[in-house]
Amino acid sequence: MSEQSSSSRYQQLQNEEEPGENAQASADAPPPYSSIAGESSGLFDYKDELGFPKPPSYNVATTLPSYDEAERSKAEATIPLVPGRDDDFVARDDFDDADQLRIGNDGIFMLTFFMAFLFNWIGFFLSFCLTSSAAGRYGAISGFGLSLIKWILIVRFSTYFPGYFDGQYWLWWVFLVLGFLLFLRGFINYAKVRKMPDNFSTLPRTRVLFIY
C-alpha cells in the first residue's frame, strides 16, 4: 500500500510540473518567420519611402578591376595635369630689376632715337648693337626710319642730287613708305612694352620674346 501511494504521489507531481515546463518552452521559442515578416514589412516600406539608396547587387559589389585597369588608374593619378609648369609660373607682385633693365626706360629710347636720326645707319647700328634693352632697340628702329624719310626728302627736292628719281618716282614712294613704317613700328612697339609691367603685375611669371 505504501509503495502504491508513493508512486501515485510521484506521478501526480510529474503531472503538475509538465504544464509549467511546456509554458516556459513555448515562451522561449522564437516567433515564426511569417509573423516577423508581417510586422517588419511596414518598417521596410517606410525606409523605401524615405529614399534611402538600396545596396548594390552581389555581382556589382564583388566586381573588381583587372590588373591592367588598376595600373592604368594608378598611373593617371600620379601624372600631373600640366607637367613642368610649376617652375615657369611663379607668382609675383611686380617686375624685378632684371626685367626692368631688359625693357629700359624713356631716356634710353630717346638717346638711341637721336643717335640713329642724326648719324643715320652708323648711329642705327651702334645704338642697336650696344644696347640690349627693348627701349634702346626700338628707339634705334624708330630713329632710323625717320632718318630714312629725311634723306629721301633731301635727295628728292635738293638741287645737289639731280636725276636720282627721274622717271622712277615709285622708288621714291617705296623708300618713303618704308621709313614711315619703321618710324611707327618703333614707337608703337615701345608703347606696348611700356604697358607690360602694368598688365603682368598680377599675373604669373611670363617669359616674353621681343621681336624687333
From Swiss-Prot:
GO MF annotation, one: WW domain binding
Source organism phylogeny: Eukaryota, Metazoa, Chordata, Craniata, Vertebrata
Topological domain spans for side Cytoplasmic: 1-107, 156-163
Record's protein name: NEDD4 family-interacting protein 1
Motif annotated as PPxY motif 2, chain positions: 55-58
Keywords on record: Golgi apparatus, Membrane, Repeat, Transmembrane, Transmembrane helix
Placement of sequence motif PPxY motif 1: 30-33
Recorded name of the encoding gene: ndfip1
A GO cellular component entry from the record: perinuclear region of cytoplasm
Location of the protein in the cell: Golgi apparatus membrane
